[in-house]
Curated annotation (Swiss-Prot):
It catalyses: tRNA(Cys) + L-cysteine + ATP = L-cysteinyl-tRNA(Cys) + AMP + diphosphate. A motif ('KMSKS' region) lies at residues 266-270. A motif ('HIGH' region) lies at residues 30-40. It is found in: Cytoplasm. Its EC number is 6.1.1.16. Zn(2+) binds at C28, C209, H234, E238. InterPro entries: Cys-tRNA-ligase, Cys-tRNA-synt_Ia_DALR, Cys-tRNA/MSH_ligase, CysS_C, Rossmann-like_a/b/a_fold, tRNA-synt_1_cat_dom, tRNAsynth_Ia_anticodon-bd. NCBIfam families: cysS. It comes from Pseudomonas aeruginosa (strain ATCC 15692 / DSM 22644 / CIP 104116 / JCM 14847 / LMG 12228 / 1C / PRS 101 / PAO1). Its cofactor is Zn(2+). GO terms for biological process: cysteinyl-tRNA aminoacylation. This is Cysteine--tRNA ligase. HAMAP family: Cys_tRNA_synth.
């Protein structure tokens, strides 16, 4: 029985789809003005694992993740670069897809872009105006009337009265209330804009997601996800817009993943304390980065550090060493391990608990390989199958172990040195053999001489 923590109710609930076996999930995606940082990677990987598990459980899942391709940050960066905004966004979208592929992230079923849904935004805004939830003061802007929506604050547990304390209307804004937020922004000189019933302009951020989600999944759907920094105001405002416009409940369950932190602060571009996925992948194998992101529960924060990445590498080394050198085999039944793995994942997608089951499996594989190679191989196949549900341990063990965490060793150079050492040993040139071994050790390479020849791996 799958249970998920619903931010809306602040409780763990038994998951029941709205319609039969169908699950419709929308996740807030990237604002594509720069390369993805590791915090974005955390959200991508978290909902990738959730997607894999829902499908494994037999649900008919439709996964939608949007792209915000018009925004103040995009306009500012394009102006800084001296390029059209859509040239910038196309380049960043391509880079995002490359990062995802390297982290073994499955593609969403749909990936709508905000600029493809302008007409839908006009329609929802007009509906909100007609119902009295929005107003156009005549300056080209359109605002949402927060005080009219009785349920405002129900996701984030904020009270409108408390939010008004200290709130103020900025110069140039034509709001009725400091809490009102923009649905449509009147055009400014030199900015991209679209025609609308209220004049040239562009959409506000919040209306984009309300329109894209309901367009792709319907007025009501099962799961809405994103980083926990989006809970307020973005997701709160989405609920206010969508439920006022449709008169129906918006998303049944809200899932929020924790942040990547550095020294206790959220990793973010605005704070300048971020590492792009690309920068991290220059030093660490993609699977090391992915494992770091799944080793903790998706709602927990992850502290970014070199030490934590090295620990992730060491964990994967243990797994791949358990899988190494075993023949192909059908997966063992391993009912107890399978049931405990499933119990962890059914408990709000508890990947940390699932990984602990994988470690127990790896220990048992290592124990069995000394006495029953076929049983070890079958259990290893089950280990690989379960790990695949988390998107890890699908490489050839030797390939991963030789690639290492940092990828700075040239495999061809290592193989050439090993061959030279074998030739030195055959010629009984022990001094040369030892010199080559010392050279390899200095490179971080560990040699393992066995009956089948010499294999190598990188030191932990």
């Amino acid at each position: 029985m799958l249970q998920i923590y619903n931010t809306l109710s602040k409780t763990k609930e038994v998951f029941t789809p709205l319609v039969g076996n169908q699950v419709r999930m929308y996740v807030c995606g990237m604002t594509v003005y720069d390369y993805c940082h590791l915090g974005h990677g955390r959200s991508m990987v978290a909902f990738d694992v959730i997607t894999r598990w829902l499908r494994h459980r037999g649900y008919d899942l439709t996964y939608v993740r949007n792209i915000t391709d018009i925004d103040d940050k995009i306009i500012n960066r394009a102006n800084e670069n001296g390029e059209p905004f859509d040239v910038l966004t196309e380049r960043m979208i391509a880079a995002m897809h490359e990062d995802e592929a390297r982290l073994n992230i499955l593609k969403p079923d749909q990936e709508p872009r905000a600029t493809d849904h302008i007409a839908g935004m006009h329609a929802m805004i007009q509906t909100l105006i007609d119902k009295g939830y929005a107003y156009a003061p005549g300056n080209g802007d359109v605002y949402y009337r927060v005080g009219k929506f009785a349920g405002y604050g129900k996701l984030s547990r904020r009270r409108v009265e408390d939010l008004r304390i200290g709130a103020r209307i900025e110069p140039g804004e034509a709001k009725e209330d400091p809490l009102d937020f923009v649905l449509w922004k009147g055009a400014k000189p030199g900015e991209p804009s679209w025609s609308s019933p209220w004049g040239e302009g562009r959409p506000g951020w919040h209306i984009e997601c309300s329109v894209m989600s309901t367009c792709c999944l319907g007025d009501s759907f099962d799961i809405h996800g994103g980083g926990n920094d989006l809970e307020f105001p973005h997701h709160e405002n989405e609920i206010a817009q969508s439920e006022a416009a449709t008169g129906k409940p918006y998303a049944k369950s809200w899932l929020h993943c924790g942040m990547i932190t550095i020294n206790g602060e959220k990793m973010s571009k605005s704070l300048g304390n971020f590492f792009t996925i690309r920068e991290v992948l220059e030093k660490y194998h993609p699977e090391v980065v992915r494992y770091l992101l799944i080793a903790s529960h998706y709602r927990s924060p992850i502290n970014y550090s070199e030490e934590n990445l090295r620990e992730a590498k060491a964990a994967l080394d243990r797994f791949y060493n358990a899988l190494k050198g075993l023949p192909e085999a059908a997966p063992a039944e391993a009912a107890e391990y399978v049931e405990r793995f499933a119990a962890a994942m059914d408990d709000d997608f508890n990947t940390a608990g699932a990984c602990s089951v994988l470690f127990e499996l790896a220990r048992e594989v290592n124990r069995l390989r000394e006495s029953d190679l076929s049983a070890a191989a079958a259990l290893a196949a089950r280990l690989k199958q379960l790990a695949g549900l988390l998107g890890v341990l699908q490489l050839e063990p030797e390939a991963f172990l030789q690639a290492g965490a940092e990828g700075k060793v040239d495999a061809a150079e290592v193989e050439a040195l090993i061959q030279a050492r074998l030739e030195a040993r055959a010629a009984k040139n022990w001094a040369e053999s030892d010199r080559i071994r010392d050279q390899l050790t200095a490179m971080g390479v560990v040699l393992e001489d066995g009956k089948g020849g010499t294999t190598w791996r990188l030191a932990d």
